[in-house]
Amino acid sequence: MSEAGRAAWLAWKLKTFGDEKSIWHDGLGVEQVTRLRGAARADALTMLRQGLALGDVHAARALAAMDDPDAAAAVRVALDRSEGNERVWLAVTLHQQRPEPALAGHLIAVLQTINPMQPWGFGRVDAAIGLRHFAGRDDEAALLAAVADAHYLVRYHACESLISRWKITPTSIAAHPDIFAEIRDDVGDHALARERLRARARRPLSA
């Protein structure tokens, strides 16, 4: 693609979704394009396909949210090539459009991949959050294991996702002080926290 085409895509992306820092901090506002109709939608699809051709995973996620059949195959290629939080939210977006439990495997892979330079990051927290949108046994097991993760933010969001999946009330882990006390610190009894979560949801310990 020409430099002019690349520049046009980047300018449109900035105008539509904000800069990269805003997208990282606030998330990709796919509603900016999913709400469009008629010619405006067609124009957005054209620009997003252009972004996808440039390898922009944000374009892939927006196209997935718009449920664009013409880009479906290319979006899947983008998913397989993506990493970290971008892989997480592209998989979640696809699942939200058409439930596909196997997509949880992408989130599990991110959750279980530790970057020595940033052990809690590289999408691991996002994966713990994103798994609340699934309901399979393998992804439940991955979240339960993450309750004992070495890093607090992963533990916290794994608990929050299990609470959401199991429909436990109150809906915040901080509102369950006997569990929160065990995951708040690295020296807490994380196995006990896991058992108490299961008990709160009346889930058998062998499940």
Spans of model-derived segments:
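Extended repeat-based scaffolds of very large eukaryotic assembly and lipid-transport proteins
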Residues: 1-70, 77-88, 95-124, 174-180, ...
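Internal alpha-helical scaffold/solenoid segments in large eukaryotic proteins
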Residues: 56-77, 87-88, 131-151, 155-157
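Extended alpha-helical scaffolding segments
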Residues: 126-204
